[in-house]
């Protein structure tokens, strides 16, 4: 084909789910240059050759090639009834069966394109996040924001566990992209969602805890966005006789009230881990923090989590909404954030 195919929107989200985070990215310099597929930095392995650069390639054949490649990565065939693609301008749009073509309206920023195979690119997650508002609900987009800025990767298309990894984007990175052009479709909504996203979640459970606090009340959250994740607390010298560790990290922290929320999952049931947790709580309480623990069992039961969230609201000094309507929304949000936990609470 004359121009490389750029995966975008939901197809890009599907790709980022199954892509191995440890693989190096190959950035495209432009969609127009002859060297458009040149890398900013040499990848450690050659890119797959799919045959998309063959002269006179029929669009229907290109659809089949791309679909087969995505399926080989682990994307279910039923998710590929159409493949979302992106072009710079409307005159480049084509509508072969199997492709859903979106128009960016300007040259696509090359720094936000990743080459994944010869002749095939994908928008990066900053761009994909802005596009996500066209098919995700707000809670889904909020969760996606936390995942993009997290220190883990979770494949929503697999039943496997999450994997730990370095943080790839910061909230500041994402906001900066939104601010490049606020008139860009989806940018205003994405920027609003990012006000409730925070850097550095270490697990889906931490993300779930943060969402229960930060999501809007209309979505079942406490509507309290002024939190930090993994807030570091150094143990002062005069308290070091109380703990082995020199510092602790609080999973979710509200600075205004000094409230800390810890998520203790099933891995905290180990005897040694329980002893360390008890020591942590003792020291943090001695330092004046108002500590509250959430458990997987509470997340698994509506009323238990509702009571726990009431306690968090009380500690933070915000109103507890005990209405039936809010409890329904809160339970919907609870079910949403734990939908992939597969019993690993």
Ranges and model annotations:
Residues 1-185, 324, 331-345:
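Short gly/ser-rich loop at a beta-strand->alpha-helix junction or flexible surface loop bordering the NTP-binding
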Residues 164-345:
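Surface segments flanking catalytic/ligand-binding clefts of nucleic-acid enzymes
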């Amino acid at each position: 084909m004359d121009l490389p195919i750029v995966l975008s929107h939901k197809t890009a989200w599907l790709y980022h789910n199954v892509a191995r985070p440890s693989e190096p990215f190959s950035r495209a310099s432009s969609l127009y240059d002859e060297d458009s597929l040149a890398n900013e930095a040499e990848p450690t392995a050659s890119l797959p050759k799919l045959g998309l650069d063959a002269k006179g390639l029929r669009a229907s054949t290109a659809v089949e090639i791309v679909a087969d490649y995505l399926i080989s990565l682990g994307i279910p065939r039923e998710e590929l009834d159409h493949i979302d693609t992106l072009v710079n301008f409307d005159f480049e749009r084509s509508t072969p069966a199997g492709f859903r073509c979106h128009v960016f309206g300007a040259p696509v920023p090359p720094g936000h394109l990743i080459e994944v195979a010869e002749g095939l690119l994908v928008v990066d997650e900053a761009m994909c996040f802005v596009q996500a508002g066209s098919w995700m609900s707000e809670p889904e987009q909020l969760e996606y924001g936390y995942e993009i800025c997290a220190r883990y990767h979770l494949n929503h298309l697999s039943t496997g566990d999450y994997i730990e990894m370095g943080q790839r984007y910061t909230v500041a990175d994402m906001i900066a992209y939104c601010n490049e052009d606020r008139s860009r479709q989806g940018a205003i909504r994405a920027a609003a969602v990012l006000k409730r996203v925070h850097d550095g979640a270490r697990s889906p459970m931490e993300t779930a805890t943060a969402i229960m606090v930060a999501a809007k009340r209309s979505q079942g959250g406490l509507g309290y966005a002024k939190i930090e994740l993994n807030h570091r607390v150094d143990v002062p010298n005069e308290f070091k006789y109380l703990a082995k560790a020199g510092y602790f990290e609080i999973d979710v922290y509200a600075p205004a009230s000094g409230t800390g929320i810890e998520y203790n999952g099933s891995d905290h049931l180990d005897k040694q881990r329980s002893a360390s947790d008890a020591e942590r709580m003792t020291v943090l309480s001695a330092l004046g923090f108002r500590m509250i623990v959430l458990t997987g069992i509470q997340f698994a039961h509506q009323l238990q989590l509702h009571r726990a969230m009431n306690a968090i609201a009380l500690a933070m000094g915000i109103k507890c909404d005990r209405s039936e309507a809010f409890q329904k929304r809160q339970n919907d949000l609870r079910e949403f954030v734990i939908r992939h936990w597969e019993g690993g609470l």
